Amino acid sequence: MRRRGHVHLALRRIAAALACVFAVASTTAADAPKHEIQDPHYGDTLFHFFQDHYFTSITTLMVSEHFDRVPHHADEAEVLRGGMLLSYGMQREAGEIFAQLIERGASPAVRDRAWFYLAKIRYQRGYLDEADAALAQVENHLPPALEEERGLLQANLLMARADYAGAAAALAAMPGKTPGARYVRYNLGIALIRAGDSARGSAVLDALGQEKAENEEFRSLRDRANVALGFEALTENQPKAARGYLERVRLKSLHANKALLGFGWAAAALKEPKLALVPWLELAQRDVGDSAALEAR
């Protein structure tokens, strides 16, 4: 269930990037080439994709490619297929697709997206130098949604090298009113805390942790911010504050187990052992593969 949620969020971001591609294309000058669907089978793939029928979308696309039904959108189709495979955790297969697009001299827009996704794959696999090298190949042809993700990826690479101050500076310089601004703020809060500025970082996360969230993606991010706040408060020997933050987390969210574990620790620190047992007993009945559930056993 948890893995499915992460896949869905990743695919939503691909959808946002695709939407940006078509939006930018629709507002270009009259003499510029229009981004129109010339192959009906590619249009069918996009229809399923934007309806959130991702499995149908990728299988339809693979069949269409096999029978050479998307000749006018061959590179775009490969970027889409690679992005979906990456979202499903198939990093090797996705990486091969993006590498082939680069090798065969795809258009600058396609090439930039291929390099970006290669950088993302390498970061996820822990190849930081290779991820940096791939990201450095990206020029200025990314759609706005991916340009924002590029900034987030760069900040994550800095944090992976423990350059938290550098990551915080990079994140603080990013635009504040964008579709992914909440992710920027979340990462900024984490970077500030790890850079030693707990007060500022916690303030950023606290604001995010109390915001109204219009969909599950942002509700999950809000829960994540509150869990981070709770554990930072525990680190700072503030169990009462930690409990307040962790109480905001939904019991059925992706981050509920960690929140329950932290809530128990907060209660124990406040000399309330009976109250600590309540979340820990609940955790003991949950998924044995979850680290928080295992720690409560």
State where each predicted segment sits.
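Acidic, polar-rich low-complexity tracts and alpha-helical solenoid repeat scaffolds
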Residues: 2-8, 27-297
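Bacterial N-terminal signal peptides
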Residues: 13-25
